[in-house]
């Protein structure tokens, strides 16, 4: 469950280290984002020489959450951190590598490029 002011780790190699959620996309009263939802975020920490720098406002898709996500078969999946991948307007990742596992829910939301780059899909 990601909401405004939530800090997330970045799961790609764009140069950003931490993001802060500014807005959850998908309706004016939308409060929470889960795995596969798109957010608007601000870069709070970045490494020098990266694609993005501190203070940039970016679009990102949530790939891991601490809050458990219920699957249609009744099982739950949860991770030990909140993480997101920075994307462009066409929902393609801006980085060339994805770090850490990602949830299978991204496949239903048509983030196939992220699925193919990820080392593990849970």
Swiss-Prot record:
GO molecular function: large ribosomal subunit rRNA binding; structural constituent of ribosome
GO terms for cellular component: cytosolic large ribosomal subunit
Keyword Ribosomal protein: yes
InterPro entries in UniProt: Ribosomal_uL14 (IPR000218), Ribosomal_uL14_bac-type (IPR005745), Ribosomal_uL14_CS (IPR019972), Ribosomal_uL14_sf (IPR036853)
Function statement: Binds to 23S rRNA. Forms part of two intersubunit bridges in the 70S ribosome.
PANTHER family: 50S/60S RIBOSOMAL PROTEIN L14/L23, LARGE RIBOSOMAL SUBUNIT PROTEIN UL14M
The protein, known as: Large ribosomal subunit protein uL14
């Amino acid at each position: 469950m990601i909401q405004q002011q939530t800090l997330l780790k970045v799961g790609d190699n764009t140069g950003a280290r931490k993001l802060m959620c500014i807005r959850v996309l998908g309706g004016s009263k939308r409060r929470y984002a889960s795995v596969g939802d798109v957010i608007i975020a601000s870069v709070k920490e970045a490494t020098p020489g990266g694609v993005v720098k501190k203070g940039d406002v970016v679009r990102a898709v949530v790939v891991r959450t601490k809050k458990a996500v219920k699957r249609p078969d009744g099982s739950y999946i949860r991770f030990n951190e909140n993480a997101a991948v920075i994307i462009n307007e066409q929902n393609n990742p801006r980085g060339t590598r994805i770090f850490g596992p990602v949830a299978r829910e991204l496949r239903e939301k048509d983030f196939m490029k992220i699925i193919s780059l990820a080392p593990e899909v849970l």
